[in-house]
């Protein structure tokens, strides 16, 4: 798609990663702060409330949610991790937060990698501003 814009990738090694949908949305801005574009992408496994018993066969355990943008000075990214199937166990020890990794590149140059902890019950909403030059 755009080789000179931003690429955002979200992954997790958590075995229950399949229980979550991931949505990425961002506004792309020029150096003066004017929005010049918008991009969105989703990795949807199931409808919210599906309460699946196991990972669907057509969903890779190590799936990646990815978003590519047009070239721009900076973006404001919104990342949503949304549970569609809640944990089967109510014990706190069995439902500790799990990790995701967010990798952000611009024109194929890695800008940053962030690790985030996600609550198994509520998921997460993350907002990030990312400059193309940092």
Predicted regions and their residues:
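Exposed aromatic-hydrophobic patches
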Residues: 62-69, 123-133
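Short, solvent-exposed aromatic-acidic interface loops
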Residues: 114-126
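Short, intrinsically disordered low-complexity segments
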Residues: 33-87
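Short, surface-exposed binding/anchoring microloops in extracellular/periplasmic proteins
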Residues: 1-36
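Short acidic/polar inter-strand loop motif in beta-rich domains
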Residues: 15-17, 84-92
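Extracellular or exported targeting regions of proteins
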Residues: 80-85, 97, 113-115
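Short coil-to-beta strand junction motifs in C2/discoidin
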Residues: 21-23, 92-101
